[in-house]
């Protein structure tokens, strides 16, 4: 068994936790390798580029917040990911720092279960060549620095859904429904639901609402504007600047993410705890 470790190097607490984990693994003679920057910051000689970890490791450990886990998920493909929350919110990273070592020990002993989360794939043609980007949470197309309100044209399986005059459009998985989409007024969706939600950002339309659709649908998005360049973001990372009328096709990815589950917590508890439900202001 070999473990790939990815650390949020901007947090000293995550770096300290990674060093503690490395000592623990060394004592048990468990093979591991750090992502290159994580190795540099923790002082480890066990290092590999993030792009190579998936071929070298059997599982991943993400030490940080949900952002670190999203970064890890871009490279983990179907390998199990143990998410340790050293961030603030931690919807995806299931384990606290105190739970880390027992969780890793159970995993090494084969005593664990998996939460499989579906992903989105955004595809487009650039100079005749296809490009594809994956997202666990969401794909966002926004107006960026464009000075006016563009129209975002959305089609479902080739049929026109609507033209949205807005600052942008969020296409989120059920996993991503508690992220940017929720902040923009989208619904919270149970993570195993086979749906995606389309949420407009600050629409200049009184009657527009987020819409939940089957994740088997193919979603086409283009921007109707005379000029400008429009950011395409996947899980918060800029992937491309889109030209007006350029079409992005978003659909369910054939690759899913396998998160190691924390058996001591359930989804309803997470919602109550993270969103402060049931507490007086």
Curated annotation (Swiss-Prot):
EC number: 2.7.1.23
One GO CC term on file: cytoplasm
Family listed: Belongs to the NAD kinase family.
Catalytic activity line of the entry: NAD(+) + ATP = ADP + NADP(+) + H(+)
Domain of life where this protein originates: Bacteria
Keywords: ATP-binding, Cytoplasm, Kinase, NAD, NADP, Nucleotide-binding, Transferase
SUPFAM superfamilies: NAD kinase/diacylglycerol kinase-like
Record GO terms (molecular function): ATP binding; metal ion binding; NAD binding; NAD+ kinase activity
Role according to the record: Involved in the regulation of the intracellular balance of NAD and NADP, and is a key enzyme in the biosynthesis of NADP. Catalyzes specifically the phosphorylation on 2'-hydroxyl of the adenosine moiety of NAD to yield NADP.
Cofactor(s) the protein requires to work: a divalent metal cation
Sites where the protein binds NAD(+): 66-67, 137-138, 148, 165, 167, 178-183
Any one GO BP annotation for this protein: NADP biosynthetic process
Major localisation: cytoplasm
Name listed for the protein in its UniProt record: NAD kinase
Active site, per annotation: 66 (proton acceptor)
Cellular localisation: Cytoplasm
